[in-house]
UniProtKB/Swiss-Prot annotation:
Belongs to the G-protein coupled receptor T2R family. It comes from Papio hamadryas. GO terms for cellular component: plasma membrane. This is Taste receptor type 2 member 9. Gustducin-coupled receptor implicated in the perception of bitter compounds in the oral cavity and the gastrointestinal tract. Signals through PLCB2 and the calcium-regulated cation channel TRPM5. Residues 33-52, 110-128, 203-233, 284-311 are cytoplasmic. Residues 1-9, 73-86, 147-179, 257-260 are extracellular. It is a multi-pass membrane protein. It holds the Pfam family TAS2R. Keywords: G-protein coupled receptor, Glycoprotein, Membrane, Receptor, Sensory transduction, Taste, Transducer, Transmembrane, Transmembrane helix.
């Protein structure tokens, strides 16, 4: 019988999982249906589909990890299973962060106007550049995830065959290396989003000064596009600022022993990021927003028709 804290944890994690998978699944479904209808897919749709799929995987892994910790705490005594879970979790987490940074770079190249030859070349080659970044993000996530976790497990296994002193040294070094690699892997996408934000802000300030000189008004389409992109990147950065410290605590478990309560709180907080950001993406995309509002109207009408008549 779970305790009160464990029951609250189960309710929260199940609710977050349902909301997150539904939101990200909605993004995948709408874009795939549109893809089949038009027989074509846009670059932004590819980014959103990739991001949503990676987050669905991340949500499932985090939730599965939480239920193992809570209901089957002895599961991770099987080192192979722990290594597999670590690898899948690391891959889903890193791919989610990298795909989000790819979305920020897309906003930057699509909207910003910066008078530099290299930036101008990137804008001309935006499709190839973004697709290359997407593929690179996928490969980087694979490199960071599976080989590192596999090597760590191998060294951890070797450490148990020696004396206690040697075991501590061997198991701690790969654990520290793993933690450092995970942290750097999450930090690079954050820095790319931060750079995109400042370049978008610089482009907006410059554009605002230009339209003030020509007295054309401040709410032109380019300004609106700048503002929407900046808001999207700011929201992501704020969510990541909340997510990243918890991520550091969760990845330090190989060096610092953690209690069940800390791990449960960590799971709850880390699930908030991929769950909530999906709805921000839906409301920030005209096609997704229209489909979402249409679905809400359908559900509202269905519930109204199903409402029983009073006496």
């Amino acid at each position: 019988m779970p305790s009160t804290i464990e029951a609250i944890y189960i309710i929260l994690i199940a609710g977050e999982l349902t909301i997150g998978i539904w939101g990200n699944g909605f993004i995948v479904l709408v874009n795939c249906i549109d893809w089949l209808k038009r027989r074509d897919v846009s670059l932004i749709d590819i980014i959103l589909i990739s991001l949503a799929i990676s987050r669905i995987c991340l949500l499932c892994v985090i939730s599965l990890d939480g239920f193992f910790i809570l209901l089957f705490p002895g599961t991770y005594d099987i080192n192979v299973l722990e290594s597999i879970m670590d690898a899948v979790w690391t891959f889903a987490n890193n791919s989610s962060l990298w795909f989000t940074s790819c979305l920020s770079i897309f906003y930057l190249l699509k909207i910003a106007n910066i008078s530099h030859p290299f930036f101008f070349w990137l804008k001309l080659k935006i499709n190839k550049v973004i697709l290359a970044i997407l593929l690179g993000s996928f490969l980087i996530s694979l490199i960071i995830s599976f080989p590192i976790n596999g090597x760590w497990y191998h060294l951890f296994k070797v450490s148990h065959e020696e004396n206690i002193t040697w075991a501590f040294k061997v198991s701690t070094i790969p654990g520290a290396f793993k933690q450092l690699t995970l942290n750097l892997g999450a930090m690079v996408p954050f820095m790319l989003c931060l750079i995109s934000f400042f370049l978008l802000l610089f482009s907006l300030v410059r554009h605002t000064k230009q339209i003030q000189l020509h007295a054309t008004g401040l709410r032109d389409p380019s300004t609106e596009a700048h503002m929407r992109a900046i808001k999207a990147v700011i929201i992501f950065l704020l969510l990541l600022i909340v997510y990243y410290p918890v991520f550091l605590v969760m990845t330090s478990s190989t060096l610092i022993p953690q209690g069940k309560l800390v791990l449960m709180i960590g799971d709850i907080v880390t699930v908030i990021f991929p769950s909530s950001h999906s709805f921000i993406l839906i409301m920030g995309n005209s096609k997704l927003r229209e489909a979402f509002l249409k679905m809400l109207r359908f559900v509202k009408g269905f519930l109204r028709r199903r409402k029983p008549f009073g006496p």
